[in-house]
Regions:
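Mid-domain catalytic core of redox enzymes
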Residues: 3-102
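Tryptophan-centered motif/residue detector
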Residues: 50, 123-125, 160
Length: 173
């Protein structure tokens, strides 16, 4: 079987559990498929200035992860259904390379925010989303002072959103 979707969707929905051996069904059923990354989109009124980066560097993929201890702490928080006080982010500003993504003078920032648990203890209510978004923007401010003032529009897709909107099992991508 060749498939472009995750193993659970492939075997459960496309092939059908009734068409495969019990051992395979058990292994597929036991796969952990809960995502732990959120997707952030920001519409910005201008290009953000990250401290210490020149224009060429700003156009590259930016990883915000000061040290291994922070990664470990963020992972542990997610493991227990919480988001970390300091997130790990993979940030890009694609409009620096493709001006059609935003109106003239404006930009878009896209980030993968690691260790955002699918099963957040308090659930992904609007209050939880707002708290997480505030935390992310506050952290971005440490690296790109003034970025909060540039935000025209923002969107946060949690693992639950990714599961529901894009049919990604467990919001895992």
């Amino acid at each position: 079987v060749v498939s472009n979707v995750d193993p659970k969707a492939t075997f459960e929905n496309l092939v059908g559990f009734n068409n495969i051996e019990t051992g395979v069904v058990r292994r597929v059923s036991n796969l952990r498929m809960q995502g732990n990354a959120a997707k952030l989109h920001l519409a910005l009124s201008a290009v953000p200035q990250f401290t210490g980066l020149d224009d060429a560097q700003l156009g590259q993929r930016l990883i915000i992860s000061p040290n291994m201890k922070q990664i470990d702490q963020a992972f542990n928080s997610a493991k227990y259904g919480e988001f970390s006080g300091e997130t790990i982010m993979d940030v890009s500003i694609p409009s620096l390379h493709d001006s059609t993504l935003a109106p003239e003078g404006s930009h878009v920032l896209s980030a993968i925010v690691q260790y955002a648990p699918y099963n957040l203890k308090q659930g992904w209510s609007q209050q939880a989303r707002d708290s997480f978004m505030s935390l992310i923007v506050e952290q971005l401010e440490q690296y790109a002072p003034g970025i909060g003032e540039l935000i025209v529009e923002k969107q946060l897709l949690t693992p639950v959103d990714l599961s529901e909107k894009f049919n990604l099992t467990g919001g895992h991508w």
